[in-house]
């Protein structure tokens, strides 16, 4: 007896799936380049926590283990005063910027920042145990300091970067949850904002949710969320706006090995050990991280980088005239100690009560860019593709797509504000909404910082040397040669002398 196959038959989708194409297919690059640079960018604050007075932050938290996310605002090239107006037709083309080079400058000396907690949950030294400690008291917290994992990172894209961390998830229905049970974990992907903490060696997690004792990690992260860049998610972005390229260097080693005080939530199975005469000690082990040596030989910053081909489909085009540069540099994380006298008349002998100690961390940045002017021909196919990718781009260009025809008959009243008719739907707000409203970034405005004189800037001179592009307005300085009274050429005169 014949029977049909048990394999499933997969039917193709009714409409063809649109293919994502690279920006090089519809963006034409010109030979016009501009240099733009920021001013000296400085940040000063307390490295562990913000200082508040009357519920108002008077000293911000500034740590060497924070993300610095720069939102670079560029001028609209379609409203730009160009040296050559014949490069594009405003009726059928639009101009965009392409980032072709950048240099992230870092000031301040190399240094290692120390963090810690005066009440850290450290019970016993399990690396070099002098005795077997099995009965911890009610409070065994001690004062411990450490250095963190070493990280250097630079992410570049035209959209904010994404980060990942572990947070508390939701329990399934029907599960009996008791107080003290381990909560379920959930991988959360979110936008990395300026001031978010990086992974310090204790994991990318929400410590406020998953460590309720506030004593398992140092002060600067015990109530914070440490994020790690979500490279997999950004690499899978179909349009490649979040990540043109990235530079990364991480290193860490385990310096000390401790265990935690407290009740063990999950006991060791009896088949894994032979019972002894002593009570089993705590088996919740952890290590203190260390980033080891910092050296100028392994620096990612203070050097130029040229973008020839991005890893995604967006080859450096700055949609919306925005560029996001995300920086992490823990090799300059020195925490400075500031001492202030509490009285104007100090005693001859030292008294610690006459002085107040403060902690401060400072950061210094300088951003330099090379931008290339590009044109886009506004064909129907290109405009439809851009509208599918990001409709706000066409809105910024004062374009709109007509809606599809509606087969239903709509009602329109003469007197909209009349009480004799039903309440009408509110008119939608036509003001342009900031797509990044509610997110915190360090904004760098470069609208008035563009210059075509590349040879007048350090990064511009490096770009001219690397690419061989001539400056747009070279100045040739030469010495005028005096007119010769002889009619013979130099070659003729040399031959005449040899005879």
UniProtKB/Swiss-Prot annotation:
Lineage: superkingdom: Viruses
GO MF term set: structural molecule activity
Keyword Disulfide bond: yes
SUPFAM superfamilies reported in the protein's UniProt record: Group I dsDNA viruses
GO cellular component: host cell nucleus; T=7 icosahedral viral capsid
Keywords associated with the record: Capsid protein, Disulfide bond, Host nucleus, Host-virus interaction, Late protein, T=7 icosahedral capsid protein, Viral attachment to host cell, Viral penetration into host cytoplasm, Virion, Virus endocytosis by host, Virus entry into host cell
Gene Ontology terms: biological process: endocytosis involved in viral entry into host cell; virion attachment to host cell
Subcellular location: Virion; Host nucleus
Entry-linked InterPro entries: Capsid_L1_Papillomavir (IPR002210), Capsid_L1_sf_Papillomavir (IPR036973), dsDNA_vir_gr_I_capsid (IPR011222)
Residue span of region Disordered: 472-499
Similarity-based family: Belongs to the papillomaviridae L1 protein family.
Functional summary from the UniProt entry: Forms an icosahedral capsid with a T=7 symmetry and a 50 nm diameter. The capsid is composed of 72 pentamers linked to each other by disulfide bonds and associated with L2 proteins. Binds to heparan sulfate proteoglycans on cell surface of basal layer keratinocytes to provide initial virion attachment. This binding mediates a conformational change in the virus capsid that facilitates efficient infection. The virion enters the host cell via endocytosis. During virus trafficking, L1 protein dissociates from the viral DNA and the genomic DNA is released to the host nucleus.
Quaternary context: Self-assembles into homopentamers. The capsid has an icosahedral symmetry and consists of 72 capsomers, with each capsomer being a pentamer of L1. Interacts with the minor capsid protein L2; this interaction is necessary for viral genome encapsidation. Interacts with protein E2; this interaction enhances E2-dependent replication and transcription activation.
Name of the protein this chain belongs to: Major capsid protein L1
Record organism: Human papillomavirus 13
Gene that encodes the chain: L1
